[in-house]
Amino acid sequence: ITVLGKMPCELNGKDKQKLGVTLSEAGFSTYLNVKDIIRILKKLYYDFDEGEFRSRCDRLRIPLDKNIKDFSTGMRAKLRMLVALSHNAKLLILDEPTAGLDVDARNRLLDMLRDYMEKRPDSSILITSHISTDLEGLCDDIYMIHDGNVVLHEDTDVLLDKYAVLKVDEAAYEKLDKTYILKTNKESFG
């Protein structure tokens, strides 16, 4: 695996400036507020865009003076994403970035990612998500991984055009041509 054309162990400080990362449980001390984080980001990233960061905080209703320890799970998730987007990274690595967000916040965040990619066509996003609809409008390729193995790799357009999820009762399932079924999941309800 290479990152920005290099082996990970070869990345230098300047290369790492080009990475934006969100992890589900990582970040700043919870005793800091967003204004404190802005001061840190200005020192960490030479390309930190404070104006855009503040604007995004405002759009996602992230208070600047409140300590992170008093943030909800969703507010913390939004802040992690805004930090990743704050310094014009060439590669975003996002682990479940919309987990814990309500539908409105999730859609706003996805719009920000789409906007980010439109303004930076030479950038890439590596994103993990259990919410497949989050991926449809963002990704060119989708990899499905199960137990550490790639079980499906397909262009997003092909995936949307040629694959589907069917929810049927047992009688309808028995009538289906099983040749085209990749996976089944029996549920106890509905």
Where do the model's predicted regions map?
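Conserved N-terminal glycine/acidic-rich loop preference
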Residues: G20, P63, F71, A77-K78, ...
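Helix N-cap at the start of a conserved alpha-helix in ABC-type nucleotide-binding domains
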Residues: V103-A105
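Conserved ABC transporter NBD signature motif
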Residues: I1-E10, K14-D15
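ABC-family P-loop ATPase nucleotide-binding domains
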Residues: K14-Q17, L23-R80
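A short, proline-enriched helix->beta-strand linker immediately N-terminal to the Walker B motif
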Residues: L85-K90
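ABC transporter nucleotide-binding domain
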Residues: L110, R114-L126, H130-G190
